[in-house]
Amino acid sequence: MTYQWREDGADADLLLDGASQEITVTDTNGTVSTQTWSYPSRTDCLSCHNPHAGYLLGLNTHQLNGDFTYPSTGRSDNQLRTLNHLGLFSPRIDESAIASYLSSVPLTDTSVPVETRVRSYLDANCAHCHRPDALATSFDTRFTTPFDEQNLIDGSVLYDLGVEDARVIVPRSIQRSILHRRVS
């Protein structure tokens, strides 16, 4: 099912069919452009929610392995530990092992290397499609894939967006880097 936010942002409405909407996007240089945002229909579900993505496009262990301040109590604790205490894992996880689990981080967390922040962002926002055997397989943005196996640097792209000799990321060439255009 697809929801579309109302103009005031107060709530979202269920769309029974697919739809598209023109949105205004301002890039990092201040350039304003119009982009079409597509809302998939119910018949489009399996194009993303498929066996290669594990059917569920949701959180991964490494996305939950970090502290979170719970607004209702003001307490902060590791989300995996909290969910374990609430009995939401079956079987329960060994809490002494949590520290050894991978942990992704927010893009804004400047206390960690930029590579970790970018890999965390790409995993959360792109890896449901950009992974082996999925629909868009020219590169792999999963957090767990070693960097040298991701095919991001000078990796080929399926859709060049009209950019001559486009690649996923081209060192020292933001103009030819499709990833920059996609996330801007």
Predicted regions mapped to residue ranges:
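Extended surface/linker regions that mediate inter-domain or inter-protein docking
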Residues: 1-120
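Periplasmic/extracellular electron-transfer cofactor-ligation site
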Residues: 42-57, 124-149
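Electron-transfer interface patches adjacent to heme c in soluble/periplasmic c-type cytochromes
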Residues: 68-118, 128-133, 140-184
